[in-house]
Design a protein with these regions (language model features):
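Short, charged, surface-exposed interaction patches
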Residues: 2-9, 15-230
Length: 230
């Protein structure tokens, strides 16, 4: 009888201990349930553009269409020769069909013009020879000396290899986010838990500045939420 009472007391004591352990675990879980930190991770690179599209527009004006057409062809040939002399290939050069404007055909046009027709065309260079294009742009004044009227000249630079940089930059952004979260956890007397949510990451490509559009600034920002533990 005495042994039965001792056994019952022991079982009750064990039950109380287990109950206390479960209660403590539940309280700890409840306390940690809503503890989290959301941080951003940043990765940046500066890289040279690896693709450029350069458009050069030229025009001639006058009253004799056949002569104007010949004059436009002459200017186009001079531009193409200039481009090839600066290291660009025929396959990288495209000449658009000429565009003709008849000023007399415009109802709102002025009648005191010294010429009737404007014939224009655009020569486009698409290449990965960024350095050669940059040099040619600085030398395009040579075309003016040859009598070529450049109406407009615009170069658009790109970084086409961006997709290859994404994994490396994303990994760096995540690493930086984790580092920030660990610093926050340490300052809060907590330890960093698992990732609760993670953003895909926002990628941006911009010119480094307005004077060097051929230098690109790559930027990726990721947002991650970590749990915190006591």
């Amino acid at each position: 009888m005495k042994d039965n009472r001792l056994l019952a007391a022991a079982l009750i004591a064990i039950g109380i201990m287990l109950l206390g352990w479960y209660i403590k675990g539940g309280i700890d879980n409840f306390a940690n349930k809503d503890r989290h930190v959301t941080v951003k991770g940043l990765a940046e690179r500066e890289v040279p553009a690896d693709k450029v599209t350069w458009s050069i527009s030229t025009k001639v004006t006058g009253n004799d269409l056949p002569m104007l057409y010949e004059g436009l062809n002459l200017q186009t040939d001079k531009i193409k020769k200039f481009l090839k002399q600066n290291g660009l290939d025929e396959k990288e050069i495209t000449v658009n069909p000429p565009s003709i404007s008849d000023l007399e055909a415009r109802e709102w046009g002025e009648n005191n013009k010294n010429f009737r027709y404007i014939i224009s065309t655009t020569i486009t260079v698409a290449t990965n020879k960024v350095e050669q294009v940059n040099k040619a742009i600085f030398r395009q004044g040579e075309l003016l000396k040859q009598g070529v009227a450049i109406e407009n000249s615009y170069a658009n630079y790109e970084y086409a290899s961006f997709q290859q940089m994404k994994p490396e930059m994303m990994a760096e952004a995540i690493k930086n986010a984790q580092k920030t979260a660990e610093q926050f956890a340490e300052a809060s007397n907590a330890s960093l838990g698992e990732i609760q949510t993670a953003g895909q990451g926002q990628f941006e490509i911009d010119d480094r500045d307005q004077n060097t559009p051929y230098i690109k600034k790559l930027r990726v920002v990721t947002t991650i939420t970590y749990s915190l533990r006591n």
